[in-house]
Amino acid sequence: MVIKAQSPAGFAEEYIVESIWNNRFPPGSILPAERELSELIGVTRTTLREVLQRLARDGWLTIQHGKPTKVNNFWETSGLNILETVARLDHDRVPQLIDNLLAVRTNISAIFIRTAFKNNPEKSLEVLTHQLTTENSADEFSELDYNIFRGLAFASGNPIYGLILNGLKGLYTRVGRYYFSNVQAKELALSFYKKLALLCEQKDTEHVMDCVRQYGKESGIIWHELQSPLPSDLEEVKR
């Protein structure tokens, strides 16, 4: 087990999460008692308590007063906020995880972008206004792309779409920094934003879904070309 965390709390959190992932503490099992676990990890019981509470909030554990702490089946109890952690823990499944992420983005954005153009065209055009060119960095493109999708999600008038994008941010922007290191990816994105802005200006909501789905297909092709070889840590990608 290789743990990169620097602080005692960070170390304890990574230790427990990796132990759950690797079935040292399998779903449905009971965690060791606080004293035993704190000695095993090498942190104080106060630090351990804070970590356990945080992991319970994220869905990894169930803590009930007077009862032992139970390990959850995190796929059933956690939220989108664990995606980055899962990507770090299981590099072999990262391509599949990201394929699923992109499919979800395409499917829900086809709905909320159309709704945003109907309900809030002025705000939508404001969100789509940018000054980027292919000369801008992958980091800048990743941030812009995320902000455009998130901005249009909130412009739809249904904040739940925005909250979903909030939950995806960590993994989304990490993937984006790698994806937008490719010039074709930048060119395709700029063309997509331009097409969306034109549809919004023309109040043409009928063709939004086709536009989004086509972008999903074309960006998916570029992504699959970039997957070999995929960096072991997307955070190490040149920005």
From Swiss-Prot:
Q: Gene3D superfamilies of this UniProt entry?
A: GntR ligand-binding domain-like (1.20.120.530), Winged helix-like DNA-binding domain superfamily/Winged helix DNA-binding domain (1.10.10.10)
HTH gntR-type domain location is 6-74
Q: Which GO CC annotations does the UniProt entry carry?
A: cytoplasm
Which keywords fit this entry according to its UniProt record?
A: Activator, Cytoplasm, DNA-binding, Fatty acid metabolism, Lipid metabolism, Repressor, Transcription, Transcription regulation
Q: Which CDD domains match?
A: WHTH_GntR
Q: Which InterPro entries does the record associate with it?
A: FA-response_TF_FadR, FadR_C, TF_FadR/GntR_C, Tscrpt_reg_HTH_GntR, WH-like_DNA-bd_sf, WH_DNA-bd_sf
- Which molecular-function annotations from GO does this UniProt entry contain? DNA binding; DNA-binding transcription factor activity; fatty-acyl-CoA binding
The record's subcellular location field reads: Cytoplasm
* DNA-binding region coordinates: 34-53
Q: Which residues form the signal peptide?
A: none
GO process annotations (BP): fatty acid metabolic process; regulation of fatty acid metabolic process
| HAMAP family attached to this UniProt entry | HTH_FadR
Q: How does it assemble?
A: Homodimer.
Function, in words: Multifunctional regulator of fatty acid metabolism.
Please identify the protein, giving its name as recorded.
Fatty acid metabolism regulator protein
Supply the source organism for this entry: Proteus mirabilis (strain HI4320)
What's the encoding gene here?
fadR
